Design a protein with these regions (language model features):
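Metallocarboxypeptidase
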Residues: 191-196, 202, 210-387, 394-396, ...
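A short, amphipathic beta-strand motif
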Residues: 382-389, 415, 455, 462
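Short, acidic Ser/Thr/Gly-rich low-complexity loop/linker segments typical of extracellular
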Residues: 393-423, 442
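A short, solvent-exposed beta-strand micro-motif common in secreted/extracellular proteins
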Residues: 423-434
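Structured interaction patches on ligand/partner-binding surfaces of diverse proteins
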Residues: 433-460
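Alpha-helical segments with a strong preference for the paired helices of cellulosomal dockerin domains
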Residues: 465-486, 493-517
Length: 518
């Protein structure tokens, strides 16, 4: 009987969806509710490449191709077809929502109205030729400044458009209130803010989770360790050529900048999901990152201002570790953190994937303070400029915290770095090819604005003759012994002027590796 009922539902969905599917040239996927008897079922579905989209502890919402329906039934899964993707029932532009053209006009109007604070750029085109718009908000939008970079991205899944509306409203909110609200003026003056309201414009127009090639973009980013096993800075494989166009554009853009904090918006639940989504373990098991405590704190800064989210009965405090909820492969947030050093979280805004337009004002009101508070988190931690002490030029550098395996990186063109940290005392190290590692110990981080520590890196050439040799060692010895006064700082390793500087210069001249944290 169950199989017959499922068959009838499928026939109904297919009949309604047939002409629609032909128009968009996308194979229809079924949205099924699967009874998860144990977590191994959830892991199996993920490993089969199906898009698990929600899990409440008993039932999972899963997107599957047509061919998988009978297969899962034959394997003993209890499931119910609850919809199709694309959906024939949802209007392309329900009342209250912006379609792609209207969104484009909205962004262009903002850029024209606030030319001193904004720049609107295209990151590239989608499969069907639509622009992926990014609006840059800054007090100096044409200048790369010594300040942290932040981004909001929405609607990587085209059937989850409420985040697009919130991104538009948030951009407008910042710009309209810049001249009258000191708090907003502060974040616009001190942060380079980027907003991509619609990452999957084709999917949004077609009312589908996927892009126009039928690919789930949030299951298609390079995955660790299958696609890369080290950071981009250390030569990690970008693995971009085989990616979907929308992913290629986001990856290139992310690596052209130096983002410290990010979030991407979804719907279908109400929770802030923080990394890791996948560390090789099973669903339902915590996969903590090296910055787990920091991430929980940042996630809470969003959730606590959204009362419904914060009071969730499923997710205590409105936050969850990604893998503890359910594992995904190829997600954007893990790629950002593991590959570029940018902390990114996935924020689920509403339990309904495509709420009626009448809900939009309420959802915006519930999330406005959360969006601003989350953005303000990027101003915390430790920051500074890293430069060549002989030339003053910026140095692209890896920044490490003792006891934490996840580095961040400085901006290659500006030289600024920003390391998000909780209040406490930390030992930092700064390393770059061709330079002596530099350490700064006992850095105090307060509950407020970031502590500043600028870092002058040395290649060991302290007499500035273009090479590192015995003459540099001899000069260092004479300065340390007080024989030869010198008006420049030759503390090349950050440990104070002493024998370690001599040893560092010797090692540098002989190309001997120098310990970062002895």
């Amino acid at each position: 009987v169950k199989k017959f009922l499922i068959f009838l539902l499928v026939v109904i969905f297919l009949t309604i969806n047939e002409s629609f599917a032909q128009k968009v040239s996308l194979p229809v996927w079924y949205i099924v509710q699967v009874n998860i008897k144990n977590l191994s079922d959830l892991n199996y579905l993920e490993k089969q490449g199906y898009s698990v989209d929600f899990f409440d502890g008993k039932y999972a919402r899963v997107y599957i191709p047509e061919t998988a329906l009978e297969k899962l039934q034959s394997e003993g899964f209890e499931l119910q077809v609850i919809g199709t993707d694309p959906s024939p029932y949802i209007e392309k532009t329900p009342s209250g929502y912006h379609n792609y053209a209207e969104m484009t006009q909205f962004l262009q109007d903002l850029a024209n109205t606030y030319p001193n604070l904004t720049r609107l750029i295209s990151l590239g085109q989608s499969v069907q030729g639509r622009e992926l718009w990014a609006i840059h908000i800054s007090d100096n939008p044409d200048v790369e400044e010594d300040e942290p970079e932040f981004k909001y991205i929405s609607t990587i899944h085209g059937d989850e458009p409420i985040g697009t509306e919130l991104c538009l409203f948030f951009a407008e909110y910042l710009l309209q209130n810049y001249s009258t609200d000191a708090r907003i003026k502060n974040v616009v003056d001190e942060v380079s803010i980027w907003i991509v309201p619609l990452m999957n414009p084709d999917g949004r127009e077609l009312v589908t989770r996927r892009n126009a090639n039928g690919v789930d973009l949030n299951r298609s980013f390079p995955d660790y360790p299958t696609d890369f096993n080290t950071f981009y800075y250390d030569g990690g494989n970008l693995s971009i050529e085989t990616r979907e166009p929308e992913i290629q554009h986001i990856m290139r853009w992310s690596l052209e900048h130096n983002f410290s904090l990010s979030a991407n918006f979804h719907t279908g639940a109400m929770v802030v999901n923080y990394p890791y989504d996948n560390d090789g373990g099973p669903s339902g098991v915590e996969a903590p990152s090296p910055d787990d405590a920091l991430m929980k704190w940042i996630a809470t800064q969003y959730a606590i201002h959204n009362i419904s989210m914060y009071n969730s009965t499923q997710f205590p405090g409105g936050i969850t570790n990604g893998a503890a909820w359910y594992v995904i492969t190829g997600g954007m947030q893990d790629w950002n953190y593991r590959f570029t050093g940018c902390i990114e979280m996935t924020i689920e805004l509403f339990n309904t994937k495509f709420p009626a337009g009448s809900w939009i004002p309420t959802i915006w009101n519930d999330n406005r303070e959360s969006m601003l508070s989350y953005l303000e988190c990027v101003l915390r931690g430790v920051r500074g400029l890293i430069y060549d002490r002989n030339t003053g030029e910026p140095v692209w550098t890896k920044v490490l915290v003792q006891g934490n395996t996840q580095p961040v990186f400085s901006h290659p063109r500006v030289g600024n770095y920003h390391r998000l940290l909780l209040p406490g005392t930390y030992n930092l190290a700064f390393t770059a090819p061709g330079y002596i590692p530099y350490r700064v110990n006992g850095v105090g981080v307060i509950d407020g604005w970031a502590t500043r520590r600028d870092v002058p890196l040395s290649d060991g050439d302290i007499n500035v003759d273009g090479k590192v040799d015995d003459e540099d060692v001899e000069l260092a010895v004479r300065v340390i012994l007080g024989i030869t006064p010198i008006d420049k700082d030759i503390d090349v390793d950050g440990n104070g002027l002493g024998a370690s500087d001599i040893q560092a210069i010797i090692n540098q001249s002989l190309s001997i590796p120098i310990a970062i944290f002895p």
